[in-house]
């Protein structure tokens, strides 16, 4: 045997393999990557100066320093630019859709066209506006056709008559100032009012009118079916804005949290949230008329519904459709038409666990797919249900801040950070497995419920990076701040170990999607806290939310 020949052959094969690997990693993979490493390492715009005891200001690279944050829809009115309001949004939705696209609600087999829903809302509108009611309390899920149409009609009154929808976590146990109308789900809930029905000028019950015969009501009570009786399909919603832009400055909604703190949100919060969601889609993957948004009903429960309107209206504005689904019943078959899914992480994990395949070939596909994703290359080769999930292109995972109640109370004393390695949110490696098995992009979003409309921050559509275990055990990457917000880290006396020089601290934000405390004592505390940590200037400290801004400009929150 010629050993010299064998040695040459081995060396030649080794050189070919190394050369092919170099060529693949240096050139071919770069052409296939959705986003370059340079782009992923520079995701935020950072102000050039900072004050003592705080970091520079961070904002998404989509809204560079010196340019305005996302503040609305940028509509024209003569020589002016308007932010817009609900009236503009619904008018445009009806013009784009011609009433044909649909929404499917829970508890109903049929889907409702927008012309039906618009006709119902316009039929309800006179009843909610003819007595000059102040606020309209809504304690019914938006995932039902009754709750949705009543909310829609209430939003119409916010522009036309000034009556404001007030989203409630439950039927109030105490009298709420200025709430003249109460919307509840059933006669059972009506029975539990136990005398408090006298607080309201009108009560709307979303239940069968026949059952009303069992109750001897001394107040003005009407059912949803009676309200919409005689409605007709309507493909138009006429709205002409006033010349002084006054409608853009009106209130959009009040939202009360489960711990009884109420915040008000202006029309600019709504339109900015819509624009922010639209802006989050990269070139080539924009929203289109084929979109079908599926929303978990848990995210649509009355006061929690604050987070769904931006996504829902954005999809409808592009001629898409939507549905609400009970998270306990999510399966691959129920997602056949879905292009965008908005739910919580545990629901997606459960879906994958119930459909994952354990064969050797499937494991090879999954390993291959996750490796490609870690290189920045998207693939659908490991999708668990190729037929059912064919249309699914992006999943939005809602993650809430650790203690929204503490943030809502604006406490004087700042809590201590207590780090833990116990991570509830999926690691970056697990997120890539979810992407691989669903065959879709996954965007992780951070919410501060009841206080901020839309996400505080979210990961990039194309960000598939995998961090080391030590990083994942310590922090969660939530990407950049929403384009409606800018933020900074501030130093706190109770956490001296967080080094502001290393961009560590407590998160403060300001922008156009933040609610304003309604109660005078909460408002006073909020102003005092803003002055203490931000020098006023509109900053809102998210008390107890500790993290850092990375070299890539992304927001990293410590595991607590």
From Swiss-Prot:
UniProt topology in membrane: Multi-pass membrane protein
TM helices/strands, residue ranges: 9-29, 61-81, 136-156, 305-325, 442-462
Cellular component annotations (GO), alphabetically ordered: endoplasmic reticulum; membrane
Source superkingdom: Eukaryota
Subcellular location: Membrane
Keyword Oxidoreductase: no
Record's keyword terms, sorted: Membrane, Transmembrane, Transmembrane helix
Name of this protein: Putative uncharacterized protein YHR045W
Originating organism: Saccharomyces cerevisiae (strain ATCC 204508 / S288c) (Baker's yeast)
Lineage summary: Eukaryota, Fungi, Dikarya, Ascomycota, Saccharomycotina
